[in-house]
Every structure is written in C-alpha cells, then in structure tokens.
Amino acid sequence: MHGQSPLIRTARGLRTVKTRPSSCRQCRTIQISAAPTTETPRIGGDAFGLPANTSVHDVADARFEVLGSPYSMLSVTLSPSQKLYTRRGTLVGVAGQADNAQSTLSILSPFSRAFLGIPFLYQRISSSTPLTALISTKSPTTTFSILHLDGTTDYMVAQRNALLAWTGHTLLLSPRVSRGLSLAHWGSTHLSGRGLAALSSPGQIYQLTLGDGEEFVAHPSHVVAYSVSRNPPLPFRLKSSSFRLQIPSVTGLFPETKFFKTMRDTDTYKAIGRFLFSLRTSMRRTIWGDRLFLQFRGPTTLLMSSRGVRVADVLTNQEVNEISDAQAGVVPKAVELSSQPKAVEAASTEQAPSAIHIASVAKDGKVSFEDAKDLKEFVR
C-alpha cells in the first residue's frame, strides 16, 4: 500500500483549521450600498409591498425596473388608466397595444420651475390597456435609481435634472426654496405622498444610511436626493488653514476724497466692479469649489452619485459667495439665532415738560401773561 500523498495530508490539515470569530469593538452604523435599481413586487405582494389579500383598490398600478448597468434603460409597466409622467424626449419605445395609448405634453408650473432651473416639460402617457414603456436618457454615462414612496417618508431631490419619471395618484411634486437654507433647497423638488419615482444621475448611484446622532459631510454635486427628517442639511465649508489671519482694509489707509466718491458713481467703475465680482465667483467655483459641502445629521437616507455634476447646477452665484465669505463654524450659530425670537425693545417715550402760565387782569381791563418758574411760586 502506498502512503498518502503529502498534498492530500496538507489539504486535510487545512480543513481542520477553524477560524475564530473576530469581535467588532468599534462598529459603525453608517451603511453604504448600491441603490436598488429595480422595484419588483415581493412574493405574494405588489410593487408597494402589500400582501396578496388586499382589496382591488389598493393594488399597485405600476412597476419600475431598471435594465442593464451602467448604460441602463427604465422599463415601466402600467395598468389601465394609470398615468406616467416622463421628461420630454426620453421615451424610447412602447410594448403592448399602442393604438390604445395616449401621449400628451404636460407643462408643470412653468414660471416657478423655470425660475429655479427645473425642467417643466413632461410627457404624460396613459392607456386603456396594460402597457410597457421604455425610457432612457441622452447621456451615455447615466444610471437610474428607483424611489419607493409609501406615504410615511418624504424625499428631497437635490439635483435639478435628477427627476426623470414618476407615477402615482397621490404623489405630489413641488419646487422648494428656503430662504434660511437656500443652499440645500435651491432648485430642489419635494416628493410627498405615495408612488414611484425614477431618478437619473451620472455614474453609479449609492445609498447611504445614517444612524441617529451620526454626521456626514458630502459635496453638493454628488447628492442626488435625501429623505426629509427633523435635521435639515446645513452648509459646511472646510478650513483652508488652522491660523486665522486678518487682512487690513487698504481703503481705510487713504483719506476719503471727493474724487473717489465721484468715481464710485460712474458707470465705468460699476462695470469694472461687476467684472471683478464675476471673476471672483468663477474662481471660487473652479479653484476653491472643493471646499463647499453639505453637512447631514442622522437619522436620514442619502442617494449619492459616483460622478458629480457641475457646481453651477446645484449652487447659484449668490450661494457660492455667501458660503465662501462666511467663516467656518458660524452657520450653526446663525441657524440657532434665527430660530430664537427676537426681543422687542420697548421704546421709551419722553414726556414733554409741563409749564404753568399765569394770567392777571388789572383794574383798567388789561391782561398780562407770565410764566411761573416753579409750582411753589404759583401757590404763593
């Protein structure tokens, strides 16, 4: 009998080696995963996760599914009389009885959306028979992600061109601008209600889940959407240096003359000032644009894209200059001060001094007037 091969003995020895479970001492609850690219119904349920024994009125009317990655297409399955809103020029094809389908141009709040830079031309598709539509974008590096809104959590779409298609009888879309936090809400779309929404963004879309008390700082060009929670995102700027240096004002060293006052009122001086202001804004976007961020606090859910859009698509000129001019760490204090009511100072009204006038009538009928200096003198 031949002995066992040393290779077999080595393989058996490796089988007997047991790995000890490693204990996680400092586990993080922040979870980053690829966003679900399909919204198929569960076994025994519909696209909204409802059980199979629900009534006919509660059954989902549509199903979204993403085909392929990263050059993906969106497949939308519609039930009869269900309305699908998709961006104009994104419909690729229709499967089913196309004679029963109807497509109309829908204009959604053109004034408010055009002012915020949000697309307002959409195509409304409906059919009296079941229909399947294919939707795609013109960009070759765009992927899709599906948002499932069940009525309990609202979402804010941060990028202007991220919302591609949606469906749902109770799904409401409204453009939002917050004067207190215009950075996070400028050109955003608020989604509320119940339905399905498809988002498109350059690169791959990832889902980031923050636990309670956790913080995450993200560049606004990579934030596609986030869930609306009790902690709104705050503008954040990274420090360029640990030393705080103050540059003295050069104009304060020279005396104020009439020549400089007259030059400031001329059109040439104002044109040069606008040119320098635009040059500073463009340099802040191109050179120092990596210092503008958004700070999120949990619990919340973020959808982030691997390839960010331009800063000009998410921030305006005023917002870029406002963040760049503000000192690091002063934004939370400003938000706290704005939430507190201002103390109204009572205006003190000064009473006018009272005066006493004395009128005396003589025997000849003449009347003479004089002012009394003191009340005691008048009593006398």
Curated annotation (Swiss-Prot):
Transit peptide: 1-37
Annotated InterPro entries: AIM24, AIM24_sf, Trp_RNA-bd_attenuator-like_dom
Disulfide bonds: none
Keywords from the UniProt entry: Mitochondrion, Transit peptide
Record's keyword annotation contains Mitochondrion: yes
A cellular-component GO term for this protein: mitochondrial inner membrane
GO annotation terms (biological process): inner mitochondrial membrane organization
Pfam families linked to this entry: AIM24 (PF01987)
Subcellular locations according to the entry: Mitochondrion
Assigned protein family: Belongs to the AIM24 family.
Protein name, per record: Altered inheritance of mitochondria protein 24, mitochondrial
Organism, as annotated: Verticillium alfalfae (strain VaMs.102 / ATCC MYA-4576 / FGSC 10136) (Verticillium wilt of alfalfa)
Encoding gene, per UniProt annotation: AIM24
